[in-house]
Every structure is written in C-alpha cells, then in structure tokens.
Amino acid sequence: MIKINLLNHQSHSFPSKTTPLEIWKNWLKKTLKKPVAALFNQKFIELDYPLTQDGDLEILAESNPKSLFVLNHSTAHLMAQAIQRLYPNALFTIGPAIKEGFYYDIDFQNHSISEKDLPTIEKKMHEVALENHSMIMKKVTHDEAKRLFSYNPYKLILLEKHKEEDITVCHQGEFIDLCRGGHIPKLSLIKHFKLLKISGSYFQGDAKNKSLTRIYGTSFFKKEDLGNYLKLLEERKERDHKRLNKKLDLFMFSQEVGLGLPFWLPKGATLRRIVERYIVDKELSHQYHHVYTPIMANVELYRTSGHLEHYSQNMFPVMQLENKEKIVLRPMNCPHHMMIYKKSPRSYKELPLRIAELGMMHRFEKSGAVSGLQRVREMNLNDAHNFVRPDQIEEEIKKIINLILEVYRDFKITKYEFRLSYRDPQDKEKYFPDDNMWQHAENILKKTIQELNLPFREAIGDAAFYGPKLDVQVLTALGNEETLSTIQLDFLLPQKFDLTFIDANNKHCRPVVIHRAIVSTLERFLSHLIEENKGVFPLWLAPVQILLIPVSSSVNLKYTQEIKELLLSQGLRAEINSKEATLGYKIREAQELKIPYQIVVGDNEIAKNLITFRKYGQKNQTTTNIETFISSLNQEIMEKR
C-alpha cells in the first residue's frame, strides 16, 4: 500500500500502481470536473501514471492554471507531429512548455521556414488533433532509446547527457518523442492554440552548434482565453520600449558601432540624467559616498576576485599591452570598490562604509540575447558596496530594503516580489566551495527578511558565485519578470582581498561586504519606465515638460519665446514647435510625442498676457496666468505625480 496526501490535506492508503484517474473516480469526481493531468510530488504526470510511492497528489482540472503548463507541453508535441508530416526530414531537439506557452527547436535541414508557413502548420495541427491520438508514456532502456532515435543526432546527444537517468518516450499515433512526461490524455483536448513567431536558436544554447529554428506558440482550453491573450500581446507590442522609441526618439543603436551599444539621444540623455541625479541625491541622503572608478583593470584584479574563474564567459577578451600588462573591460564594479576600501586602514567606527557608483561596465552578451535596452553589452549599474561589521549585517540589510521601497514608491513601482536566491550545493564549479560560509550567509538573509514580515520565495541555483542574494523581481508591462534590485551577502571577497578593520580591542577583523543595486542598470530601468508608462512620463521625469505652440509662427513667436525663457528660468523643460504647419497638426504631434503640457499662444493670450494650456490625454483647455501655471507644475513635480 502507498500513502497519498490529497490537496485537501486528507491522507489515504491505496494499492501500489493506483493511478490518479482511479483516485479521481473514487474520491474526487463529484467536486472536481474535467481532470486533465496531475501533480505528484511537484512533478507533472499523466492521469494514467501508476503511483508506486508515498507522496502529495493534486489532480488538475481544466480550470486549474497549472493545467496550462501540461496543455502547452502537449501542444508542443502536437506541433512536432504536424511538422513531421509536412517536413519528414525535420529533426527535433527540445520542445518545453514556458511561462505563457511553448516552443520547439527544430533543424529543418534543407528547408527554410518563415512566419508565412505558420498558418499551414496550424492547419495540419488541427487535422492531427481531430485524429484524437492518446498520449502514451513508456519507459525504455537507454539502448532502446538510441535505436528509436538513431536518425536524430540531437536526441542521441541528449540521451548521452542523461544516460544515468530513467528514459521515457511519448507515443501519439506514429510520432514518438523523448520526454519526461506531463501530458493531457488525448490530442482532441487541444483546440485553441496559436503559433506566434519564429526565431533562431542554437542547440543547447551554444553558438558553436548549428543554427536551429525556434517556433513559439500558446494554447488554452477556452477560445475566449486565447482571444484575451492575443489582445494582451497586442497591448504589449504597443508598450514595447523599442517600438515606442520610434516616436519618442530617446536612444539609438548603430550597426557600424556595434551590437548592444546604446546611444542616448538628447531627450533620452535628459531622462537618464534626471534618474541619475535622483539616485545619487537619494543615496547621498542615506550616507553613501559616490565615487568614479576606471572602466577597465589589470586582469589579475579579476583573478583575485574570482570573476576570471567564474565569470569569464561573460567578459570581453583580455587586451595584451606592449609592456605585457593584460587589461580587461570590467564586467563588475566590485573589485574597484575593494581597492577603495583597502586604500587606508579602517576603524570599526567608520563602518558601515557605503561606497556607491553609477558604474559603466561591459559584459559579453550573446548576439541572440541582446535586446533593446534590456540586454546590452555596455551598461551603467546603480551599484554600491556596503562594508559592515558582522554585528551590523541585519540592520544594514533592513536599511537597504527600506531604501528600495522608498525608491519604488517614487517611481510608482507596485508589481514586485522578493526572491531569496541560494546556491545549488551540487554545483561545485559555479559556487565557491565553503559549506559553512554559505549556510551562515543564507541563514542571515532569510532571518532578516522574515523579521521584516515581507513575503518571499526561494530559488535554488540563482545565487552569485560568492554568496546568496535577495532579488526584487518586478513584473514588467510586457509580462516578463526582471530583476530590478538586488542585495548580495559576501563573506568571500573581503577574504580574497584581505580587507580588515581595527576593532575596539585594536585587533584586525574581517568586514562583510553587502553588494546592492537599487534600480539595476540605467538601461534596464529606463526601458522599464518607458514600457510601464507607455511613454507617458510623469511630469518630473518627462524630457520635455511643456511644448509651446504659437498659432502663427510669424505673429506670435516673440511672445512664445518670452514664455519659454521664463519657464526655463524656473527650471522647467520647455520647447517651441515653430514649424509652418496647422495648429491642429502641431497639437496632434504633441500628443504623439506624449508631452505632458501643451501651451497654445495666440493673439488673445498676447492681448491679455495669459496662456492657454492642455494636459496630455485631456480634451479640455484651461486659460490662466503664467505664474499660476508655473506654481501648479512645481507642486506636481514636488509630489512626483
């Protein structure tokens, strides 16, 4: 007999090899409708999977959001079967379910596939689904699997990589795929799906391997849900910072200069400068010391820090100089800040010592990963390293968290969660091998966030190589999860750089370093602001706050220029649209540029020494004197509305 804990916390004993479907029929049929799969000990399984051990079981109905993962995984199999019929020579690699759908990486060999082919593949998928094949899992030996996939070199490589594991395959009609499982019972349940796009990829993410075709799709149980999701995708497209930038003209890239190297154009540079000043002023008010350090360093500095050993794949090649010195562009600011700390003997009275920098860094991102401002090769990180005594760790982390929340309030960031990232103890290559250090550091971070009563989730394998970290994961307007803020606890670098402070007993002691970034890189943060605000920035952030529009450039321009000079003298950012165009055209253009305020200047305003303004997104106009207008704007800026 096996003991199964159902989701309602009831425990029951069943004969070994009882299936989830049998349990549903006998115990849950009246309360749970339309089961499609199950979750056993946090692993997705089929309804006919024979249970042979104790564990936690959740039967998944169509209405359960978790079922979408199983549906999308099954739809990836359906797509592969349809493609095999259309392109018999296609070789399949991997086809997982992902957050909002699925993809499959395919080697089409001699065929070239484009998005024009997706409707044909979709049509074939519907045909195959109507055949209503069962999705049958079968355990096979390693040798049997090699015979089944002897024609596919990609599957053979995967089999060799997992030769110590149990091998299972999924049958659906004539199609067989290597798979761990988690499928719906029959293909006829797959009705409402859409193939979304095609991109390039490499087998196992290695650019040295052959280029593959990746087809993305999504699948839902209800037609209405698919329609709503496709509408959401259109909304996200409208918010994409790359698309919005075509009108806003904030930044650019140049193929002649290089991939992932952004240019900040005048309006974008203004926006960046506002954020930079805000961050620096905020950190200075929290007793940080801002510095500037070199963007490159002797390679030995990174050998000492451990970056050369653990992070070299993300670094640009070393430059050999004429005096045999080896220089590298820095991927991190940490070693430079260690040097500043080490410059002078430090007393325990000086700690915490908070060294901050808007530091330029260079990291080698693969060409396929570079994307707009979110993934670039040159970036500017809002970075700081807080050097503390061991007894100050918890209090300092709390202060950093409060600073993060303060900044989030000002930028109206509300969709986020804390993620506590640990090392994977089995990964001896990625992480520094000191079990006691890791256990101690992880316990401190967990204890601190628990004391603040902040909800968090845990993630194994996402720590930095030198220590655990507390990340703030922000949900973007495009539905992605991005790390915006991070707090990393480090006992290792002080040891590697032999950092010390003199305690009250005149003894040398080792400080602890807390790495922290409040708004990530400026590039990523600004892309987030563009998308979150859909290009409509609050007044305090807007690169151009007021656009002055003379009714007649020849008659009204002089008074318009006087107003502009007055606005500029008050610290406001104003421009004039003096184009020879109709008033309606100028107003529409101001709306497209998403400028917060437009002031129309005509004969009536000049005669009465007034202005007429309209706020972005509003139809009504207001006429007032310039002093009242400036006062209301200053109030709006002060309140960061």
UniProtKB/Swiss-Prot annotation:
It is found in: Cytoplasm. Its EC number is 6.1.1.3. Residues 240-538 are annotated as: Catalytic. GO terms for cellular component: cytoplasm. It catalyses: tRNA(Thr) + L-threonine + ATP = L-threonyl-tRNA(Thr) + AMP + diphosphate + H(+). One of its GO terms (molecular function) is tRNA binding. It comes from the Bacteria. Its cofactor is Zn(2+). Belongs to the class-II aminoacyl-tRNA synthetase family. Catalyzes the attachment of threonine to tRNA(Thr) in a two-step reaction: L-threonine is first activated by ATP to form Thr-AMP and then transferred to the acceptor end of tRNA(Thr). Also edits incorrectly charged L-seryl-tRNA(Thr). This is Threonine--tRNA ligase.
